[in-house]
């Protein structure tokens, strides 16, 4: 999710030789006050706009950068947030909020050691601040955990959780009245019962969950990194974007558009989990349908099907709360086998993030990506999961701090080289649930309405018909869900108001 295109101004303007006049300073303060009001109203795009105007008038005020950094954090523009926080500290090394903001930005980017250094600075300056101490201690735990994971990775990196499971010996207790696989297989009856069971806020038995995970891993590992699908003229397929643990909105998609079947195929374009607090329900439902219709129900990996994101934004915590740490490890293994892209009739390419940091990438290059891993910090795999379009030509540094932003000329050149018509991607919330950019060559679809219970956005899904492949957009709005807030299982730092 991110702010609208074209709103960004540079983070670090060069200081002026002469200080601004008193009237200019007064106007800058008025703009900051307006920005603060927009921020309180959760209108972060306008908050950023007015903070930026204040900075233009007075580029030496650390508070303006600190405030805009927080607004960027709320819109998931972590790269911009990091730049603003760093600039605030450069302007005023005693501005403690600058260190808080920079730590939050680095946490969001998975740069835990860098975050720890800033939390340490805050604790030294404010040794009696309980909030600062708690954040420092929590971040320190993560750094130590990561160090431990690296230490044991050499011995166990390729050892599968599956090897240590004995599913057959797991007993389903007599008092459990929920859905069970029939002879170890997913059926349509099981799936209907499962969705109702989840709708009633009940938990699937761990044996059934493990059965689904082990079986879906077997299915996914046989797929190509680039899935290629042919639609006949009379056939259609539905493409959905981010669902982010919003299970009741997922049910609404199936209510509006029909359950998956061999005649009603789906593609879900990544970011199934995190943020929403029903991520386990979402992902096991999607995996169940993948087992039921392996050739007609498609799942692509998003940037949130990764360990770093799951550790921060809730999925790891949710699986541990509802099941066990071992089950989360198996989820992580399964996520590594999710394909990265899908091509329809050789003309429409679908991926979660977008296009590439370098020219000349071909479909064959995508096919050759070894996806069974955590994504690197750069390169084609990273770009497919993380990049975003921009309105201006060329490429620029990513607002997220990962991968890049690519312009209409980049999209046009990629499509021409690969004989494609357009791309479909997700990865960003859009007010109307979708966006058509780059002269119709870059389509964004987002399927989590009222994202995180606060954005107020519509959501959408796309129909593609084999006869012409023109995208047909279908919008929908959020439905009620049980009183469990988003991020309920997120990292403690997030719950403490890190962002």
Swiss-Prot record:
Which cysteine-cysteine pairs are annotated as disulfide bonds in the entry? none
User: What PROSITE patterns does this protein map onto?
Assistant: SER_THR_PHOSPHATASE, TPR, TPR_REGION
Give this protein's Gene Ontology molecular function annotations: ADP binding; ATP binding; G-protein alpha-subunit binding; heat shock protein binding; Hsp70 protein binding; Hsp90 protein binding; identical protein binding; metal ion binding
* Membrane-crossing segments per the record: none
Q: What is the effect of changing residue 63 to A?
A: No effect on phosphatase activity
EC number(s) stated in the UniProt entry for this protein: 3.1.3.16
The record's region (Catalytic) falls at 200-499
Effect annotated for changing residue 40 to A: Slightly reduces activation by arachidonic acid
Q: Which residues bind Mg(2+) 1?
A: 242, 244, 271
Positions annotated to bind substrate: 244, 275, 303-304, 400, 427
One GO cellular component term: protein-containing complex
> Which tissues is this chain's protein expressed in?
Predominantly found in brain and, in lower levels, in testis, but was nearly undetectable in spleen, lung, skeletal muscle, kidney and liver.
Effect seen on changing residue 451 to A: Insensitive to okadaic acid
Q: Which SMART domains match?
A: PP2Ac (SM00156), TPR (SM00028)
Location in the cell reads:
Nucleus; Cytoplasm; Cell membrane
List, separated by semicolons, the cofactors it needs.
Mg(2+); Mn(2+)
Residues at the active site: 304 (proton donor/acceptor)
Q: Give the protein's biological function.
A: Serine/threonine-protein phosphatase that dephosphorylates a myriad of proteins involved in different signaling pathways including the kinases CSNK1E, ASK1/MAP3K5, PRKDC and RAF1, the nuclear receptors NR3C1, PPARG, ESR1 and ESR2, SMAD proteins and TAU/MAPT. Implicated in wide ranging cellular processes, including apoptosis, differentiation, DNA damage response, cell survival, regulation of ion channels or circadian rhythms, in response to steroid and thyroid hormones, calcium, fatty acids, TGF-beta as well as oxidative and genotoxic stresses.
PANTHER family to which the protein is assigned, alphabetical: SERINE/THREONINE-PROTEIN PHOSPHATASE 5-RELATED, SERINE_THREONINE-PROTEIN PHOSPHATASE 5
- Subunit architecture: Probably forms a complex composed of chaperones HSP90 and HSP70, co-chaperones STIP1/HOP, CDC37, PPP5C, PTGES3/p23, TSC1 and client protein TSC2. Probably forms a complex composed of chaperones HSP90 and HSP70, co-chaperones CDC37, PPP5C, TSC1 and client protein TSC2, CDK4, AKT, RAF1 and NR3C1; this complex does not contain co-chaperones STIP1/HOP and PTGES3/p23. Part of a complex with HSP90/HSP90AA1 and steroid receptors. Interacts (via TPR repeats) with HSP90AA1 (via TPR repeat-binding motif) or HSPA1A/HSPA1B; the interaction is direct and activates the phosphatase activity.
Name it. Serine/threonine-protein phosphatase 5
Q: What organism is the protein native to?
A: Rattus norvegicus
The taxonomic lineage of its organism, from the top, reads:
Eukaryota, Metazoa, Chordata, Craniata, Vertebrata
